[in-house]
Regions:
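Conserved "HGTGT" condensation-loop signature of ketosynthase/thiolase-family condensing enzymes
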Residues: 2-96, 110-115, 122-179
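Conserved phosphate-binding catalytic cores of ATP/NTP-utilizing and phosphoryl-transfer enzymes
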Residues: 103-111
């Protein structure tokens, strides 16, 4: 999770990462595990603590990476803003969870700060695949043989990367190395 801050004058519109936070949630009982929203809230609180100042309620922008482990919670962007007590002017969730999505959201936030559209942004993403798998295994019935937590019934149009055969991280990372 990253927090960014920019300022009003052109010389101060240089985006800077001012706080980072990460959480690895591995409780013995999967029923005690955090869902993606809980993970993002905790990670952003850690990012705020990393800055040494109170910022989360002042966010101008929240961008969330789409998640697959708790699909019924989507979209999470407005829920995250509410959980943080923030009312950002820019609040959205990516259309799909891809390996390059966090860096794309980071780039978009930096561009908005540089353009003077926003001053403070948060980028967040979380998966709770271990938690959902553990819960399903713990509460499984003989008829449950499908991992419902990651089933995505939504039909999506392929994005630019997919139209060009860039479907897996191994396809995309060489582009970064050669950029």
């Amino acid at each position: 999770m990253h927090l960014f801050k920019g300022a009003m004058t052109d010389s101060e519109r240089i985006p800077v990462i001012i706080g980072v936070g990460q959480i690895n949630d591995r409780p013995e009982d999967p029923d005690n595990g955090l869902d993606p929203l809980g993970l993002m809230v905790e990670a952003l609180k850690r990012a705020e603590a990393d800055t040494g100042v109170t910022l989360l309620k002042k966010l101008d922008s929240i961008a969330v990476v789409d998640q697959i482990s708790f699909r019924h919670l989507n979209p999470l962007d407005a829920k995250l803003a509410e959980a943080l007590g923030a009312t950002p002017a820019v609040c959205y969730q990516s259309d799909a969870p891809h390996g390059d999505t966090p860096i794309r959201l980071l780039n978009e936030a930096a561009n908005r700060i540089g353009a003077g559209e926003i001053k403070l942004a948060a980028i967040a993403g979380a998966e709770a695949l271990r938690t959902i798998a553990g819960r399903l295994a713990k509460h499984a019935t003989p008829q449950q043989d499908v991992f419902e937590g990651v089933r995505n019934e939504a039909k999506r149009e392929p994005g630019y990367a997919q139209q060009h055969g860039l479907n897996a991280p191994v396809d995309v990372y060489p582009l970064y190395e050669n950029a």
